[in-house]
Each structure stands twice: as C-alpha cells, then as structure tokens.
Amino acid sequence: MLVTVEFTYILILFFISLGLSIILFFLGYFLMFKVAYEDKLMGYECGFDPFGNARGEFDIRFYLVAILFLIFDLEITFLFPFSVSIMSMTLFSYSIMLIFLIILTIGFIYEIKKGALDWS
C-alpha cells in the first residue's frame, strides 16, 4: 500500500508536467508571429552573408569524421575513471580495460585499412 501511494504522487506529477507542456506548446504556437521573410529564411554564417547556398549538401566524410570524433571522445570518457583509480584496481579491472583498448585499437586499424580517414 505504501509503495502505491508513492507511485501515485509521481504519476500525478508526471501528468501535471505533461499537461503544462502541452498547454505551453499550443499557447506558443497560436501566439507566435507567422511572418516569414527572406532574411529570416536565409542561413546564418557567423554574421556574414552566406557564400552561396547555406543549406547545401556536405560530403559524407565530414559526418564520418564527426562520428569518429564522438567515438574517441567517448573512449576518453571511459578511460578517465580508469586513470583516476589506477592505484586501487585489481587484475580483473586491468583485464577489462585492456579488452576495451584492444577493441578500440582493432576498430581504429579497420578504419585506416578501409580508408575512412583518407581525403584524397
């Protein structure tokens, strides 16, 4: 019985926040100014006039480099706790981290072999 009462409060809070979100969404939608002009639809390039079509296509290699950056940035996120607690680690912890680094190294070698980082 006690658990049900606690979940009831959470459920009430959820529905209140959901209702408030829906009300604010429709209130903003109906009260906004709907005037579109050319300057508003134009792409923004750091305060300069665009050098052509700002909504043009990008080469897929830019997305690939961005994804690779995210993967290796996430690797650093996983390696940081390892480096902070290196003095209190066990052999099991070292083996898990070694497996993690081996998998990342294999992935990096695969990327190089497939030419993912070759821009020529």
Curated annotation (Swiss-Prot):
Residue intervals passing through the bilayer: 10-30, 62-82, 89-109
Keyword annotations from UniProtKB, A to Z: Electron transport, Membrane, Mitochondrion, NAD, Respiratory chain, Translocase, Transmembrane, Transmembrane helix, Transport, Ubiquinone
Gene Ontology CC terms: mitochondrial membrane; NADH dehydrogenase complex
Location in the cell: Mitochondrion membrane
EC number of this enzyme: 7.1.1.2
Recorded catalytic activity of this chain's protein: a ubiquinone + NADH + 5 H(+)(in) = a ubiquinol + NAD(+) + 4 H(+)(out)
Superkingdom, taxonomy of origin: Eukaryota
Pfam families: Oxidored_q4 (PF00507)
Residues in coiled coil: none
InterPro entries, per database record: NAD(P)H_OxRDtase_bac/plastid, NADH_UbQ/plastoQ_OxRdtase_su3, NDAH_ubi_oxred_su3_sf
GO molecular function (one): NADH dehydrogenase (ubiquinone) activity
The keyword Iron is assigned to this record: no
The keyword Ligase belongs to this UniProt entry's keyword annotation: no
Entry function: Core subunit of the mitochondrial membrane respiratory chain NADH dehydrogenase (Complex I) that is believed to belong to the minimal assembly required for catalysis. Complex I functions in the transfer of electrons from NADH to the respiratory chain. The immediate electron acceptor for the enzyme is believed to be ubiquinone.
Similarity comment: Belongs to the complex I subunit 3 family.
Protein name: NADH-ubiquinone oxidoreductase chain 3
Organism field: Dictyostelium citrinum (Slime mold)
Lineage of the species this protein comes from: Eukaryota, Amoebozoa, Evosea, Eumycetozoa, Dictyostelia
